[in-house]
């Protein structure tokens, strides 16, 4: 059995521009604590791997302190960590993926093509790739098929499935179905999705782990994924410290109206 945590879209150092400056600064500080909560969870429940599918930073040039804090938190995890940078935190020579000293248990994919990293103790291979600019119009999964070598193959990418906008790593359904991956860990979509099976590949987005505004409502977190004898399950893990909600008053609801009329 293999157990891993799938997360994405932390967007550390977001501006929180809708808030007053003091509150925005407080929210940024709180956001940096997310990785520490994640580390506590990983160590408490014995996760084997952590897969982070991009946009951990809100830009490719966050405060150095933020990168160092994230690296320190990931270094506390008693698990191997894999990261595929996305369109906000794309890899470049001056990005935190190059300038921050990442701990030994963290592997950052830096190539714009799929790279394979073996996890021999788990008979597992992780395939990942990085955005190397703010846009990625071509699919990073195009033409890929995992070898039939008896190992379990997992993909880690930032992107969208059948996206109308072909700018952020669009992946076609037929590419996922032909990939031979047992699981495709995705980022970019901030709303958690139910696992989708294409061919033999299970695809999922965990959504963002912390809402940043009223366009990101409800519970937020990551996915606890279990691979056991070919069976794959993905369960939601709440991680958010705060939750955005919209309150609706029914005080002035008229007799012919329903609650849906107010929403």
Stretches with model-predicted labels:
Residues 251-258:
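Conserved small/polar residues in nucleotide/adenosyl-binding loops
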Residues 236-250:
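Charged, glycine-rich active-site and insertion segments that engage polyanionic ligands
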